[in-house]
Amino acid sequence: MNNEKRLPSLEKPWQKYLPKENLGIEVPNKSIYEYVRDNAQRVIDSTAIEYFGTKISYRSFLERIDRFADSLKAIGVKEGEYVSFLAVTFPETITALYALNKIGAIANFIDPRIDVEGIKQLILDAKSKVLFVLDFAYPKIKPILED
């Protein structure tokens, strides 16, 4: 067995699963927020998200991201910190992901279908200082908050 250190980032083992025409594509050195912000300018009034018939343009999406990022900073969320969400995927959670990425914080999305102990452990493992909970999931989080 070869004992030298092997770095997946250099070996790129995932490439064996990609179509050959995708292997030469260069990944931009940008955050996901920067990528969307920069590319949205070309299609600013086009639909970024459509959810149950409601369309959100890139312009509106970017404005929502900026407002959410400002709100997160206002409550003290800093770069490198985890923010947990007990939620399902809908426009607000997508906005939250990009807002957190904009300020350098990390999203910890938790599936509300898992059991209370699992939810508690995921929050503790991430050392989340902020937790967003959908109303239907509150009964699961209530015993954790009381603990």
Model-derived features: where do they sit?
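Structural core segment of the AMP-binding/adenylate-forming
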Residues: 1-2, 102-147
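Flexible, non-catalytic linker and terminal segments flanking ANL/adenylate-forming cores
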Residues: 1-29
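Residue-level signal for pocket-adjacent positions within structured domains
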Residues: 20-22, 44, 105
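Short, flexible loop segments at the rims of nucleotide/cofactor-binding pockets, characterized by
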Residues: 24-27, 60, 107-110
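Conserved AMP-binding/adenylate-forming core of the ANL superfamily
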Residues: 27-28, 33, 37, 45-90, ...
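Hydrophobic helix-cap positions at the C-terminus of alpha-helices
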Residues: 39-40, 144
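Charged/polar positions on well-ordered alpha helices
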Residues: 41-42, 109
